[in-house]
From Swiss-Prot:
Annotated GO biological process: adenosine catabolic process; hypoxanthine salvage; inosine biosynthetic process; nucleotide metabolic process; purine ribonucleoside monophosphate biosynthetic process
GO-annotated cellular components: cytosol
Family per similarity comment: Belongs to the metallo-dependent hydrolases superfamily. Adenosine and AMP deaminases family. Adenosine deaminase subfamily.
The protein's name: Adenosine deaminase
Enzyme class: hydrolase
Protein source organism: Shewanella sp. (strain MR-4)
Entry's EC annotation: 3.5.4.4
Co-factor remark: Binds 1 zinc ion per subunit.
Length: 331
């Protein structure tokens, strides 16, 4: 199912959406934060999807618990370190971990730039202990408005040498991409690549805007592109990568079932598409789960799954020499 001669990557993976249940428990107790349960076992349903839950509101509440326990910068560093460990232990060769410093900072009023530094330090520490390649993507959380995104951008750009790209995430309908054109001009001027969450809650116009105005070369989710034949043609022709997260799309009710997921439609149209976990801590999944689902529910053949693996490497924010090194390590 997973081809061991091809690098296994996860490109759409939120660091702040992957906090271990026991870490939430320990940090909550360490910092005197009231948790919604009185044991580790009973905490799990409050912070992870159980069974067939498919509610965006419930999903976001679980996600909020993951940052609610980030009471100091040591907690942030620990979570970053554990993200590297989890990526390595799940069999990944390469992962791009994205994070929103504003979202991580806001509960306990941590300094935004301090959060960025703690994430970088935690990742560096993890890379000393685990064999996996990691790059970081900064997120601007549009839901908090333009001014908050400016703060976030400045904290991230102060450490741009540790980032490969910037992302725009959050409330796509309430805060459309055009509100952030100036922010992304600064990102382009800084020489960083751009990905954006688009076509998830909003229609294809959101994706056009992200590509043509923000400068995105990859799109997170993008499920609504399938309703716009011209966009599908454009995506295929220009090799705009779709970071697809099927289980997350089900959990957030972006799609009502795996059978309705448009992954196959993208593949048949020749669009560059990869499999990713999104918020693996909330969804209680790893990358191998997504490949199992792609085979059993999305009906992809082993040859198609191998192509999806290759797509991920092609889409990755890596230099050609780094890509070759990933392949060489699998030989």
């Amino acid at each position: 199912m997973i081809n061991t001669s091809i690098p296994l990557v996860d490109l759409h993976r939120h660091l702040d959406g992957n906090v271990r249940v026991n870490t939430i428990w320990e940090l909550g107790h360490q910092h005197g934060i009231a948790l919604p349960a009185d044991s580790l076992e009973t905490l799990a349903p409050f912070v992870q999807i159980q069974g067939k839950e498919t509610s965006l509101v419930a999903f976001l509440k679980k996600l909020d618990w993951m940052v609610a326990v980030l009471a100091d910068l040591d907690a942030v560093k620990r979570v970053a370190y554990e993200n590297v460990a989890d990526a390595a232990l799940s069999g990944l060769d390469y992962a791009e971990l994205r994070f929103s410093p504003y979202y991580m900072a806001m509960n306990h009023k941590l300094p935004i730039e301090g959060v960025v530094e703690a994430v970088i330090d935690g990742v560096k520490a993890g890379l000393k202990d685990y064999q996996v390649k990691i790059n970081l993507i900064g997120i601007m959380s549009r839901s908090f408005g333009q001014a908050a995104c400016t703060q976030e951008l400045e904290g991230l750009l102060a450490h741009k040498q540790h980032l490969v790209a910037m992302d725009l995430a959050g409330d796509e309908l309430g805060f459309p991409g055009e509100l952030f054109n100036e922010h992304f001009k600064r990102v382009r001027d800084a020489g960083l690549a751009i990905t954006a969450h688009a076509g998830e809650a909003a229609g294809s116009q959101s994706m056009w805007q992200a590509i043509q105005e923000l400068g995105a070369t990859r799109i997170g989710h993008g499920v609504n592109a399938i309703h716009d034949p011209k966009l599908m043609e454009y995506l295929a022709k220009h090799r705009i990568g779709i970071e697809s997260c099927p289980t997350s799309n089900l959990h957030t009710s972006t799609v009502s079932s795996y059978a309705e997921h448009p992954f196959r439609t993208f593949m048949d149209a020749g669009v560059l598409i990869s499999l990713n976990t999104d918020d693996p801590g909330v969804s209680a999944i790893d990358i191998k789960h997504e490949y199992r689902i792609a085979k059993s529910e999305l009906r992809l053949s082993d040859a198609e799954l191998a192509q999806v693996q290759r797509n991920g490497v092609e889409m990755a924010f890596l230099s050609e020499s780094e890509r070759k090194a990933l392949y060489a390590a699998k030989a």
